[in-house]
């Protein structure tokens, strides 16, 4: 080998040796860079993952808390609706709050009324008149009035009357002697009236509209004698059953046909959607 070739070979080796120390640090640097970057990325990823997990947990806790509060509120409402009232509360609710119920209308009881000048006569015959009662009870003292109660619709007696005395001693004697007496084939019962005042004419059994063909009025009021019922033809039993309510049934039916209820229209729309058309061959 010549001197020139040896020099070239040595020059290459020196270059390669000079490059190698400078090259290795670059690789080390790159390796160190890659190594330093990768842990930071892993830590960031783990932090983001932990944050997302904590957020999801907090959200789930919020939702579960909302559901729990809603379920508790619903259960509380159901409990409040299905509350069993005590007997005392029911008794309070059963009492009416009308002004007439707060005060006692009558003194005494029906079984044992207090003595007064007004006597009630019960169990009378339909043919007993006020004149007959006046003849019977005037034996015990002066009377201020007699009132036989009549039915306003039929004009017939309802089987009882009220006799008014001027003095309470006379009414006591009349009750003791006339109670159980037979009058016009009927055994009558005499007792003190509870109200202790003059009786207004009772409406009778029929509470509907008056007859179109006239008819008489009811009994008398106050302390005076009562008035009898009047004539007029009887109405058909169709109206006595309460079908005459101030408007025609057919008008009401026509109104219902023109404006059906929303429930009825909803039901018809459902039935139409479910109905199937017949097959055509």
From Swiss-Prot:
List Phosphoserine occurrences by residue: 2, 14, 80, 82, 84, 94, 96, 237
Q: What is its main location?
A: nucleus
Q: Where is the composition biased (Basic and acidic residues)?
A: 233-257
Please name the source species.
Mus musculus (Mouse)
Subunit and interaction comment: Binds to A3 enhancer proteins SRp75, SRp55, SRp40 and SRp30. Interacts with ILDR1 (via C-terminus) and ILDR2.
Give positions of region: Disordered. 1-116, 199-281
| Summary of the function given for this chain in its UniProt record | Sequence-specific RNA-binding protein which participates in the control of pre-mRNA splicing.
Q: In which tissues is it expressed?
A: Expressed in inner ear.
Native organism taxonomy: Eukaryota, Metazoa, Chordata, Craniata, Vertebrata
Q: Where is this region: Linker?
A: 196-223
Q: Locate residues linked as Glycyl lysine isopeptide (Lys-Gly) (interchain with G-Cter in SUMO2).
A: 196
Q: Protein name, please?
A: Transformer-2 protein homolog alpha
Gene Ontology process terms (BP): mRNA processing; positive regulation of mRNA splicing, via spliceosome; RNA splicing
Name positions with the PTM N-acetylserine.
2
SMART domains referenced in this protein's UniProt entry, alphabetically: RRM
